[in-house]
């Protein structure tokens, strides 16, 4: 199968973080490159769908039944889906440059939107993991999220 919609379990998992901020019916997962130079070790979600390189091991038939680490990866990618749906399909291609940093430093009063797209996705992933018992050094408060 080349693509699929989200499973009911994945939608429930996503709702635990995003609520109704994502139109889950519009999201598809593709087991094919987003563009010809799609790196093998990366999933890409610049257009509101998630693309997995066909030679990469990150694909799942249902992320809700995967280990917590893969669920966190899925939540990270769904943050990019939310960005595309909330800010437009050009948001990621225009804001996410090749040297975009994933690591972030929380700054008091700094709004979520002031972090770059990858940092936003990591913030959401870290909150997701922390709420499920994973101990992280500096977990952001859920109140930083705009959804």
State the predicted function of each range:
Residues 42, 53-75, 112-113:
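Short pre-active-site segment immediately N-terminal to the catalytic Zn-binding motif
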Residues 57-62, 81-85, 104:
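Short C-terminal domain-edge/linker segments immediately following a structured domain
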């Amino acid at each position: 199968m080349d693509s699929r919609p989200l499973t009911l379990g994945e939608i429930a998992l996503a709702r635990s973080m995003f609520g109704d901020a994502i139109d889950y019916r519009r999201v598809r997962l593709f087991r094919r490159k987003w563009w010809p130079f799609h790196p093998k070790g990366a999933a890409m979600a610049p257009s509101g769908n998630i693309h997995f390189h066909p030679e990469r091991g990150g694909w799942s038939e249902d992320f809700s039944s995967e280990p917590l680490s893969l669920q966190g990866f899925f939540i990270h990618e769904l943050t990019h889906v939310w960005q595309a749906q909330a800010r437009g399909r050009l948001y990621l291609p225009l804001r996410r440059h090749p040297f975009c940093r994933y690591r972030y430093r929380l700054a008091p009063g700094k709004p979520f939107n002031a972090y770059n797209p990858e940092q936003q996705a990591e913030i959401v992933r870290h909150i997701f993991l922390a709420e499920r018992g994973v101990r992280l050094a500096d977990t952001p408060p859920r109140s930083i999220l705009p959804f």
